[in-house]
């Protein structure tokens, strides 16, 4: 996957996960989808690609107009940490 395309995709997943975690009640399907999204983001964050994307962002090698919240030092870490708390309070209901 191309770097810019990957960052855009991860940014989209990042935004979707943040929004979904604010919902106090969700269907089992929505909860499963959120878990899968978090798993993809976690794998990205712990892998070489995030480190390279972050380094390239710090070196100003990425387009200035590229949305990059997923590359902030704390953004993705906080989302993954917030997930640990959110999954204890989200009510799953059909």
Locate the predicted segments by residue:
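Extended alpha-helical interaction scaffolds
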Residues: 3-4
